[in-house]
């Protein structure tokens, strides 16, 4: 979703480790059986780890864990709805309203995270819609281009989390004690 075809990422996340993955993996033990991603965020560390281990992605932000659970369990419906969603400031502003429907809440979260400035839409406060002013990509402005390019790549993320992931929504200390 970054133009890099070798790594998976569902969305950019403030504090994410996407660009640091190779460096981080060098410090992983040679042999271990369980990768616990305590502060999973965009799950980029565990999504891209190639070793054969049990993967547990823990994130305290319920919007993030809901998004990944919906992507895992309702991939086609979520992606269908996202493809119908325009890249627009009104859509972004409306996405802050909570929904009782898990699929709709996941869609709204993805709108917030992908259409916000630097992915700050994962936070609990509206930091503003990312309006492209300078950068023109193949599909138009930077915001629209990134929105359009990212959605279809969610299929790859869904496939990986279905195959070998446990997703938890716990405080880090509760996750460790398990």
Language-model segments: which ranges?
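SAM-dependent nucleic-acid methyltransferase catalytic core
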Residues: 2-20, 72-178
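S-adenosyl-L-methionine
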Residues: 1-33, 46, 66-67
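SAM cofactor-binding core of SAM-dependent methyltransferases
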Residues: 26-97
């Amino acid at each position: 979703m970054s133009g890099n075809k070798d790594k998976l990422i569902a969305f950019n996340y403030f504090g994410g480790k996407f660009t640091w993955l190779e460096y981080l993996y060098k410090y992983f033990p040679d042999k271990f059986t369980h990768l616990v991603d305590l502060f999973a965020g965009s799950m980029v560390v565990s999504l891209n780890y190639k070793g054969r281990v049990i993967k547990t992605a823990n994130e305290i932000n319920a919007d993030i864990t809901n998004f990944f659970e919906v992507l895992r369990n309702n991939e086609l419906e979520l992606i269908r709805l996202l493809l119908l969603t325009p890249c627009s400031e009104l859509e972004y502003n409306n996405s802050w309203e909570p929904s009782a429907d898990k699929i709709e809440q996941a869609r709204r979260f993805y709108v917030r995270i992908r259409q916000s400035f630097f992915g700050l839409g994962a936070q609990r406060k509206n930091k503003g819609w990312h309006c492209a002013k300078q950068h023109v990509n193949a599909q138009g402005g930077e915001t629209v281009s990134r929105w359009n390019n990212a959605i279809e790549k969610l299929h790859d993320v869904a496939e990986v989390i279905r195959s070998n992931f446990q997703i938890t929504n716990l405080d880090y200390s509760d996750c460790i004690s398990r």
